[in-house]
Regions:
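Local beta-strand N-terminus motif with an aromatic residue
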Residues: 78, 94, 141, 207-210
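NAD(P)H dinucleotide-binding glycine-rich loop of Rossmann-like/cofactor-binding domains
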Residues: 82-148
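Glycine-rich beta-strand-centered segment in the early N-terminal region that forms part
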Residues: 16-35, 44-90
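Short, glycine/acidic-enriched capping/hinge loops at junctions between secondary-structure elements
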Residues: 39-43, 152
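Extracellular beta-rich ligand/substrate-recognition surface
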Residues: 2-9
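Mid-domain Rossmann-like dinucleotide-binding core that forms the NAD(H)/NADP(H) cofactor-binding site
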Residues: 120-197
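Short amphipathic alpha-helix with an adjacent loop that forms part of the alpha/beta core around
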Residues: 196-209
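Short loop segments at secondary-structure junctions
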Residues: 3, 66-71, 101-104, 109-110
């Protein structure tokens, strides 16, 4: 536990795997879990509050379906899936997790390893919200600036913006190796090497729609 925390982080095996599944539930044997800043913040908060019951963190995961409820039609045992557990529940850092069918989907196989697949849900949901709320209201050909385009959120945003016909300008720090090639592979038309603040100061805000 960190300084100032009253709880303790442990790796244990005292929790039994789920045996019964609800009609709309899915039991997944977890292969990989992606931890982001949201998960870290939740763990810090839980430790500070000294929980009376164990808290299992982890939201974004990849695994294989073990069992499905009677009303689950699009998944079956053996499917490789990825998903994002509800923030109020978490629990992915376990051998098994039971989730509602709506928070999992069949994962892409062949091009990504489970660790990479596990990172997609948390990032993908955020990018989906960005695209739905901002990009999709713009006409094709609109210019958008993506800051820190080399990270996962930036890459997915460039891919989706390019698919919608946006003209994407990417900013990446000079320290990122092969940055220009990486951004162009993900849909960038122009790549600017520099810090985010430098890039914003360099460009006039009227040059972009977003």
């Amino acid at each position: 536990a960190s300084e100032g925390s009253t709880g303790v982080i442990v790796l244990g095996s005292h929790m039994t795997p789920p045996r019964k599944v609800s009609s709309t539930g899915v039991i997944v044997k977890v292969i990989a879990v992606a931890i982001d800043n949201v998960d870290r913040a939740m763990v810090r908060n839980v430790l500070r509050d000294a929980p009376s019951t164990p808290f299992v963190p982890g939201r974004s995961f990849c695994g294989r379906v073990v069992d499905c409820g009677l009303d689950v039609k699009r998944l079956r045992p053996g499917d490789l899936v990825f998903g994002l557990q509800d923030l109020r529940k978490c629990g992915a850092l376990a051998e098994y997790i039971m989730v509602h069918q709506d928070v999992v989907a069949v994962a892409p196989e062949g091009r990504l390893v489970p660790e990479q697949i596990a990172a997609l849900p948390a990032t993908g949901v955020m990018v989906h919200q960005i695209v739905q709320n901002h990009c999709m209201v713009l006409p094709r050909g609109s210019r958008i600036l993506v800051l820190n385009a080399h990270d996962m959120i930036g890459r997915l945003t460039m891919q989706e913006a390019s698919r919608l016909g946006m003209v994407t300008v990417a900013q990446v720090p000079p320290s990122v190796p092969h940055a220009e090639a990486l951004c162009r592979q993900n849909g960038a038309v122009e790549v600017l090497m520099g810090d985010p603040l430098w890039t914003i100061n360099l460009l006039h805000e009227s040059s972009f729609n977003l």
